[in-house]
């Protein structure tokens, strides 16, 4: 549960820093990746996992393509809505890849996927309570990129901590370039509180949260590991209400039930066919 709370905390910390203007999105992303890289490097060193040669530029690009839109999206949408959008995009991406790879879903899986996609449509469809279109598009892009990153990571032969540490370090270079480019358009903005929130997102919610998740995976089947992640958007929505003063709209409730319920139906019908190494949620 601590690892899952860490994943939800990423949404809350990002929103808490960006909504009141404690940091600009590019700077927040760079600090998050930097502190995450350092934390993961220290954790990997502690396990003596070889970092040199681990990871890949493909993985780093996918990680950056998740982290940057994730931050910019939270300038426009709430924590609960963002987590639901990202979660739906991650699952849709991975299911689409499974179909492309020749996996034949069962009828219940098709029904669950249709229900989850219907929930996404409800969430982003027009109306006064619909999320900002640009913010929703950015978060869907972030979720898709995280799904791609997860698929890339499944093929890694290196220890997960070493792979993630190396990918964070490479993605940091891309984020630094983004920050430099953004500074040409608008001066960077960062308060002490914004820096603290970004560092907490990178070091604790991402670095320590991921390490706890990898440890938990040893005692979970692939299906159970996927099912327990269904609570992450709910944690984020609850945290947004209690800590950030966000409101829960009927649209969010209906969409949340449809998305989480749909994926639960799909996953409950699937039995583990081979060992796998799923990655953590947004």
Locations of the language-model features?
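Hydrophobic alpha-helical transmembrane segments of multi-pass integral membrane proteins
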Residues: 26-42, 112-115, 134-141, 152-207, ...
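Hydrophobic/aromatic residues within transmembrane alpha-helices
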Residues: 17, 28, 32, 73, ...
């Amino acid at each position: 549960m601590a690892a899952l709370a860490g994943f939800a905390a990423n949404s809350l910390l990002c929103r808490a820093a960006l909504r009141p203007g404690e940091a600009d999105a590019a700077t927040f992303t760079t600090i998050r990746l930097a502190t995450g890289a350092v934390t993961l490097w220290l954790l990997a060193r502690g396990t003596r996992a070889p970092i040199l040669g681990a990871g890949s530029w493909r993985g780093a690009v996918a990680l950056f393509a998740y982290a940057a839109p994730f931050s910019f999206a939270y300038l426009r949408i709430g924590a609960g809505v963002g987590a639901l959008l990202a979660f739906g995009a991650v699952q849709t991406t991975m299911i689409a890849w499974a179909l492309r790879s020749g996996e034949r879903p069962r009828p219940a899986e098709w029904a669950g996927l249709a229900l989850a996609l219907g929930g996404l449509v409800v969430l982003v469809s027009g109306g006064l309570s619909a999320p900002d279109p640009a913010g929703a598009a950015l978060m869907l892009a972030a979720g898709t990129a995280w799904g791609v990153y997860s698929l890339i990571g499944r093929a890694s032969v290196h220890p997960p901590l070493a792979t993630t540490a190396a990918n964070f370090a490479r993605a940091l270079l891309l984020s630094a370039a983004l920050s430099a480019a953004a500074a040409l358009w608008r001066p960077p903005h960062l308060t002490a509180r914004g820096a603290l929130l970004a560092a907490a997102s990178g070091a604790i919610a991402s670095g320590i949260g991921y390490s706890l998740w990898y440890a938990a995976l040893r005692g979970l089947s692939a299906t159970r590991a996927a099912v327990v992640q269904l609570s992450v958007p709910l944690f984020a929505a609850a945290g947004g209400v209690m800590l950030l003063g966000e409101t829960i709209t009927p649209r969010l409730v209906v969409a949340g039930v449809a998305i989480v319920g749909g994926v639960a139906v799909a996953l409950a019908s699937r039995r583990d066919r081979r060992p796998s190494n799923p990655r953590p949620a947004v």
